Amino acid sequence: MNHKVESVQGLHDDAFALYNNAVRGTADYSADTLINNLNEGINTLKSCWKGKDAGVQIQNVITVYNALVNIRNVLGKLAADSSKIASNYREIQNANGAGLSALSTITSEDKTILPDYVDTADKVDITPDAEKGKAKIDAANDNIANFIREVSKYFNNIMNNWTVGTGRDEAKTAFETFNSQSTQYKETLSSVSSNITTALQNYVF
């Protein structure tokens, strides 16, 4: 077994906590909630905000959406891999007479990124429904930092516990990269939100 684990039960527990609380949880800061909010915001804006500039702004949201999908998939795989490693270790412990309870595993299904979006219309058009799209984008933006904080609780434990193994270092690099770019993601969403407000103020309905 090409893995080194300090605490089998600890790895199992943190894997499930990461998956249930930070990846798939129903809290405002879970990856799935952030992704769903941005997806709703994108779809709303596509239907009610037209023009080249609108297309650029919507594409900016898609860029952040895809980054969230990618890190969500990485974290889901990390949780699944960690749970399987813990389960395998437990089987070995029990084969040696430990008599401990078997450990369950996680199956994580990836979400799909969105294709690029372009609006070539010269005429600008926007409806009041854009405010609903803005609200969804703001909701996601408000919770990116909370998402990172929640992930870090369990992610750091997993990294300190599972010290050697295939896939570990890739997950570590991916999360550190997302974390380092999170300020830019937040600034991007704030800029889009501000542009929606300006467009609504300037447009004559």
Region annotations inferred by a language model:
Residues 1-205:
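N-terminal secretion-targeting helices of virulence/extracellular proteins
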